[in-house]
Amino acid sequence: KEVEYAVMILDELYHESPLSAAALSTRRNIPSPFIYRVLKKLEARDILEIRRGPKGGYSLKADCEKLTLYDVICAFENTFIVTECLKSDYECVHNNDFNCRMHRQFAWIQHLLKEEFQKANLSSLLEEDPE
């Protein structure tokens, strides 16, 4: 859910900034406890910046031509995995030490998804009229 909220926040800030946390929360109906957590993680990854004061608020810091959806996902997930069995420390109770057919399929799907998320820059995702 945090990644979904992050994309909504980035969409708002892409089109108008700076915006306060309260404005972002209201516009996208994101509960206050979540908005601050998401904003903090995006700021920690240098995706957003905050300006204090009466005309302050949150703004995009990262270049949206270079920032990818994968970068946004990684701001919230330590590792990008589609299923638990792809974790390096996962012990499968069904197949001992061997990678089963499902594991190989999930690994391939993960590879494809990661590639696509790395290709999808934020500018292309957030444009009003994508080509």
Which residues are covered by each model-predicted region?
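Minor-groove-contacting beta-hairpin "wing" of winged helix-turn-helix DNA-binding domains
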Residues: 54-61
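Short beta-strand "wing" residues that participate in macromolecule-binding interfaces
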Residues: 50
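Glycine-centered, phosphate/nucleic-acid-interacting loop/turn motifs that mediate DNA/RNA or nucleotide
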Residues: 46
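Non-DNA-binding regulatory cores of transcription-related proteins
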Residues: 61-131
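N-terminal helix-turn-helix DNA-binding core of bacterial DNA-binding proteins
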Residues: 1-30, 59
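Short, hydrophobic-biased segments on the C-terminal half of alpha helices
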Residues: 10, 39-40
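Key DNA-contact positions within bacterial/archaeal DNA-binding proteins
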Residues: 33
